[in-house]
Regions:
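Active-site microenvironment of metallo-dependent hydrolases
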Residues: 1-27, 32, 40-42, 100-101, ...
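Active-site metal-binding motif and surrounding structural segment of the metallo-beta-lactamase
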Residues: 44-65, 187
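Metal-associated gating/positioning segment near the N- to mid-region
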Residues: 62-130, 151-154, 217, 249
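Active-site mouth loops of central-metabolism enzymes
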Residues: 84-97, 158-181, 232
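Short, acidic/polar
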Residues: 96-103, 174-185, 238-242
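Divalent metal-dependent hydrolysis catalytic cores, especially in the metallo-beta-lactamase
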Residues: 98-124, 137-147, 191-204, 232, ...
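Active-site core of metal-dependent hydrolases
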Residues: 198-310, 323, 328-330, 350-352, ...
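His/Asp/Glu-enriched, well-ordered alpha-helical/loop segment
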Residues: 228, 306-393
């Protein structure tokens, strides 16, 4: 949509405002510059907004809704295939340039705001600032720094003899003083939220469900110091005990909560804690792995999804705010591909209605965007004109939001986003593992030749 000297733009179509209110079938949205000026029924549209001074855009069969919010991204991860690949490969300068490129992919997918849940180096905060001043196209970001981890956390999977990799998306903390120092340094780096690694991902056996990477005292230190500095606090917590400890400590946001139980739910409700389940990552692994993984890994992921389906459905029914997030940045969830899939999962597995799922990816998700959340996530006068126009009705078919070919417009701050797909980019040798074969080449006597196996 080209710029001209009109006063603003009036869009006519089905209006889904981001709340749980039923869509306005004959609706209109008016924006002037970067801000929404009016939203409502066509019959109530003030006369000036109908005139030629406002660009008139009729959108029959289309839905006009807030731009999506992805509540769990990793814009600096570059679609790494493993923790090792992320921690050990790719220079920081190249990672940064790649992050800027990938931010545009995210925006083109209808995601106008995002929460970056952990970064390598300090890429996310600096990219956020570069986008905000207009250097690169991308969503509005709220960001974490490198998440704080202990030896039992997600990121310290390397041998004790090995130095903690500087490229890892975490900082290793060993004492209360180191926790406080890490938080204060990240506050100095202008992060929006302090995130910790509250559990590992080694939930292969049931006994691992009772493991928390930090003590209750350490969790209190994190939540208290983050709050003192005006920052949010968040945790990666899959195990039951890591969820319970963070909830008792008063964290603002819990990622995953796969093994949440009734006690956890009660404390989350009491302390007004949000959950970002991020089931897209697990479901994609299950869908992709039958051809390339062992039974034990598949069983572990299936067990976690089953537990999450039961516990998180209860949490939703109890009224815990849930945010859609995808963990885009890892290879199972490439940028620009899966940002709307979590809504379908919420509907299919957690008992959400499509309208509730949309709300979780719009207005409810603003709760994790402390700096600008009250300016996005809802079609309302005074908020940013961050708008997605899609051919179809996501309240009837939530999957239409996964089909970028159905997007007529994505507006960010009233500016139409260029939706031209980006050309594919070659992966450099220094971005990936250096391996000879994807498996072991063993001699098979019955065949009289070598066979590649696991």
């Amino acid at each position: 949509m080209t710029q001209d000297k009109t006063l603003g733009t009036t869009l006519y179509g089905r209006v889904i405002d981001g709340t749980l209110t039923a869509p306005i079938e004959r609706g209109a949205v008016v924006f002037e510059g970067e801000t929404i000026a009016w939203v409502g029924e066509i019959d109530a549209l003030p006369y000036p907004y109908r005139q030629a001074e406002y660009r008139q855009v009729d959108l029959p069969g289309r839905s006009i809704m807030p731009g999506l919010i992805d509540g769990h991204t990793h814009i600096s991860f570059g679609e790494a295939r493993s923790e090792e690949e992320l921690a050990l490969y790719t220079p920081v300068e190249y990672r940064t340039l790649k992050a800027a490129m990938n931010a545009k992919k995210v925006l083109q997918s209808g995601v106008t705001s995002a929460f970056d849940a952990a970064t390598t180096y300090n890429i996310a905060a600096n990219l956020r600032d570069a986008i905000n001043v207009g250097m690169f196209p991308g969503p509005r970001f709220a960001v974490c720094g490198r998440q704080l981890t202990t030896h039992q956390g997600l990121e310290d999977s390397f041998p004790n003899e090995m130095q903690f990799p500087p490229g890892q998306a975490a900082v290793l903390v060993r004492t209360h003083d180191e926790i406080i120092e890490a938080i204060r340094l990240q506050a100095k780096d202008r992060v929006d939220c302090i995130k910790i690694s509250g559990s590992s991902d080694n939930l292969i056996t049931p006994d691992a469900l009772e493991i928390s990477a930090m003590t209750n005292e350490e969790l209190v230190v994190v939540a208290r110091e983050a709050r003192r500095l005006g920052l949010m606090s968040a945790t990666h917590a899959r195990s039951r005990d890591s969820v319970l400890g963070a909830a008792k400590a008063g964290f603002d946001l819990i990622f995953h909560a796969s093994y949440i139980d009734d006690e956890c739910i009660d404390i989350c409700l009491k302390n007004d804690i949000m959950i970002t389940p991020t089931l897209t990552f697990l479901v994609n692994l299950l869908n992709a792995m039958p051809e390339g993984a062992g039974v034990s890994a598949l069983d572990a992921f299936k067990r976690e999804v089953d537990a999450a389906q039961e516990g998180l459905a209860k949490a939703h029914k109890a009224g815990i705010p849930m945010i859609c997030g995808t963990e885009s940045g890892w290879s199972p969830v490439p940028y620009g591909s899966w940002h709307a899939y979590e809504m379908e999962i919420f509907v299919d597995l957690l008992g959400f209605t499509p309208l509730e799922a949309i709300n979780s990816a719009t207005l409810t998700a603003t709760k994790c965007l402390k700096a600008f959340g009250k300016k996005v996530g809802k079609l309302e006068a005074g908020r940013y004109a961050d708008i997605l126009v899609v051919n179809g009705n996501p309240v009837e078919d939530i999957t239409v939001l996964q089909k970028k070919s159905l997007f007529d417009y994505v507006f960010k701050g009233g500016e139409a986003v260029d939706l031209t797909p980006q050309p594919p980019v070659q992966q450099y040798y220094f971005e990936k593992h250096k391996i000879f074969l994807n498996g072991r080449f063993r001699y098979d006597e019955s065949l009289g030749r070598g066979v590649l196996g696991k």
